[in-house]
A protein has these predicted regions:
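An alpha-helical repeat/solenoid feature that recognizes helix-turn-helix modules
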Residues: 1-41, 52-92, 104, 108-147
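Intrinsically disordered, low-complexity repeat and linker tracts
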Residues: 150-172
Length: 172
């Protein structure tokens, strides 16, 4: 945890991706341990303060789909509906539209938008495997929250039978 409340992989400047991942890792203890709850609350404050006008987030000098995805999973993991919590709505935009601005008709996500600064994570404006993976599991995490289910990494409420097809659409 940095002095600002966010998490960092290296150095002293917080990063949205690492902050989101840290919240995800600590979320099972949120509300149960004062030290963890305090750290997550400080991280949430930092995420609220650093959210971009698009509703999304950035890392290493560039707005990215993966940053928005990590924040969506983090918020969902502690029971925050980012469409309703005013801390995570900027200019009428919230993290899901911040993520879906990177969605491509081919069925996946870009790392960064065409013409955007590239921070080394993938070619701007093109379908990206890591961005798609993270975008899809962020969407699943948010849907699980909306459906009143457990967090993404807690599948204790899920049972599947061989050959069963699960509806993962986001429409309610």
């Amino acid at each position: 945890e940095t002095a600002y409340g966010g998490g960092t992989l290296a150095g002293t400047e917080p990063d949205a991706d690492i902050t989101g991942m840290t919240i995800q890792a600590l979320s099972p203890y949120y509300g149960e341990r004062d030290d963890v709850t305090g750290a997550i609350d400080r991280a949430l404050d930092w995420l609220s303060e650093t959210q971009l006008a698009s509703g999304g987030y950035g890392t290493m000098g560039a707005e990215t789909s993966e940053s928005a995805a990590q924040v969506i999973v983090a918020l969902s993991s502690v029971g925050i509906d980012c469409a309703k919590d005013s801390r995570f709505i900027k200019n009428g935009k919230w993290p899901m539209p911040g993520l879906f601005q990177y969605y491509l008709p081919e069925g996946g996500f870009m790392h960064v938008a065409a013409g955007a600064a590239n921070n080394g994570g993938g070619e701007a404006g093109t379908l990206n495997g890591m961005a798609t993976e993270q975008g899809m599991y962020a969407t699943a995490a948010y849907k699980r929250l909306l459906d009143g289910r457990t967090a993404l990494y807690d599948m204790s409420d899920t049972t599947l039978s061989a050959g069963e097809v699960v509806d993962v659409s986001t429409s309610n």
